[in-house]
Amino acid sequence: MDDYRYRDNYEGYAPNDGYYRGNEQNPEEDAQSDVTEGHDEEDEIYEGEYQGIPHPDDVKSKQTKMAPSRADGLRGQADLMAERMEDEEQLAHQYETIIDECGHGRFQWTLFFVLVLALMADGVEVFVVSFALPSAEKDMCLSSSKKGMLGLIVYLGMMAGAFILGGLADKLGRKKVLSMSLAINASFASLSSFVQGYGAFLFCRLISGIGIGGSLPIVFAYFSEFLSREKRGEHLSWLGIFWMTGGIYASAMAWSIIPHYGWGFSMGTNYHFHSWRVFVIVCALPATVSMVALKFMPESPRFLLEMGKHDEAWMILKQVHDTNMRAKGTPEKVFTVSHIKTPKQMDEFIEIQSSTGTWYQRWLVRFMTIFKQVWDNALYCVMGPYRMNTLILAVVWFTMALSYYGLTVWFPDMIRYFQDEEYKSKMKVFFGEHVHGATINFTMENQIHQHGKLVNDKFIKMYFKHVLFEDTFFDKCYFEDVTSTDTYFKNCTIESTTFYNTDLYKHKFIDCRFINSTFLEQKEGCHMDFEEDNDFLIYLVSFLGSLSVLPGNIISALLMDRIGRLKMIGGSMLISAVCCFFLFFGNSESAMIGWQCLFCGTSIAAWNALDVITVELYPTNQRATAFGILNGLCKLGAILGNTIFASFVGITKVVPILLAAASLVGGGLVALRLPETREQVLM
């Protein structure tokens, strides 16, 4: 078998002229253009002359002459790297000029609306599990630990997806990897609505999280490469609005769908498709629509130029120019660019010997090659010349996520705590009551019965909710068709009593004494108690929290290019830290909702500025990788914030408030050490 030579995403180049050499073995592909239309065969001129692209035959002859020089290795790796860096700097300035010529118009806005759906999918993913859990826990009989793992697994998936898919986007392309991310998210999110078991549901949400975790880094890197310097800060901030729109969408859909228990069906006794599963499918729609729409958008020309694909990049830039000019009513305006500088390509050859003949062995070599390149690229971001910027950004991303996600979980938990305290304050206590021969068929709620005596009483088709019988004597009583939530019998004596078709299981009797009592045909299903939360309030709190960021988003978008990224980050984080101290006065549900809206509204500007400066600080071949690393650290901060802040609910408000404020102040001050990128071209 002939040896197989693999070059990872790179093509040969001619060092003397800097043009991209496409796949020279297929000249017909290079020769397709509308420019040559109408020529006779004898007079036909190669289309590349109009674009500044050499004829493939000339390229072949030059490469044949140069082959010995490359084989001899006259220029070392360091020389090639130096030339490449010089080429990249020239390309950055030329590309900025080209984007200015292309203008900002219909093409960018079309791409904008495609990408906002991808960002919405990311925002939805944060909320979908928390909204579905109150209903899903009953179907799947989830304990507190299982519910906690379900919330954690989504963030772990998003963290892994940001690392892996962000790195792949710098090697395989923005569009390709973003499509892959959205496909993974949409397919596994939809699949999770159909699976019945907890393990399968957990796995689907993990893979769905991996898919959506890669979207955020790629979306910002992709869109930034179609924007000019004057438009970049503002329009990336407009893009950031739609992350929070995902929260609004999820809240509205949960409010509209989940309470409708009839929106479902059953197949036999083992398969149930309830309304919360419909909600999960609806939440996968933004990713699905974005994935389909993305098929009609081109790859980033800046990425293609980085890969040395000059002609493909030129055609896309011409498409951007022509689309915008037609929309402005000047279709006659000609795209004047004929030649774009492309960086020297650092070829990597992987030789596969004839013994490596099976498809999976070749696939494994390709996989290991790409993995090594992604890993090396990530190390370059962390340990190369950008290490100080990466370290500072890591601190800012982490502290921002720790405080923001920690508080956004703490707010609804505190609201539930206030609800529980108010509920307990209305508890009725009955002491020493004696009831004989009564038939009870109504709901008993929020009561404590102590040292009572119930003789020959019947409890028929009734519901116990938050009821405690303590040191109570039951004699010749009868319980039938009884359901209960958070109801217990403690230190009771139960004599000659029958329990028929009830959910009063063994664990609900604590240190009780049974004498000649029987349990007949107990209710089947889950033996756990589940709280009936005020779903309306939960959805309303999330809806208002997401809606409150809209003013902050608009202000940050309008001021991003005027005051700069650093002032926006530092100012927003410091103001948010001050807002944290107002939480000491949040002693009611309404006050806590109000302070939540204020905090979210002031902190969003820092998030937008972080997205913009992260995109601008790194070159094209590290942009998505660095963004993915930092976004992965953000999800780690979110996990720690959720865990730490939730543990202090009902214990103290001091620790969460001081921790959030200190994190925001520290991160805001550290951010001021970053370089300002407002006037910087995109490298």
Curated annotation (Swiss-Prot):
It is a multi-pass membrane protein. Residues 1-10 have a biased composition (Basic and acidic residues). Widely expressed throughout the brain. Specifically expressed by pinealocytes in the pineal gland. Also detected in testis (at protein level). Specifically expressed in neural tissues. Expressed in the spinal cord and in all brain regions with a stronger expression in hippocampus and cortex. The modification Phosphoserine is found at S33. Induction: By amyloid beta peptide. Residues 1-110, 170-182, 227-237, 299-390, 557-565, 614-626, 673-683 are cytoplasmic. GO terms for molecular function: transmembrane transporter activity. InterPro entries: LD_SV2 (IPR055415), MFS (IPR011701), MFS_dom (IPR020846), MFS_sugar_transport-like (IPR005828), MFS_trans_sf (IPR036259), Sugar_transporter_CS (IPR005829), SV2 (IPR022308). Glycans are attached at N441, N491, N516. It holds the Pfam family Sugar_tr. Residues 1-72 are annotated as: Disordered. It comes from the Eukaryota. The modification Phosphotyrosine is found at Y423. The chain crosses the membrane at residues 111-131, 149-169, 183-203, 206-226, 238-258, 278-298, 391-411, 536-556, 566-586, 593-613, 627-649, 654-672. PANTHER family: SYNAPTIC VESICLE GLYCOPROTEIN 2 (PTHR23511), SYNAPTIC VESICLE GLYCOPROTEIN 2B (PTHR23511:SF2). Belongs to the major facilitator superfamily. Probably plays a role in the control of regulated secretion in neural and endocrine cells. This is Synaptic vesicle glycoprotein 2B. It comes from Rattus norvegicus.
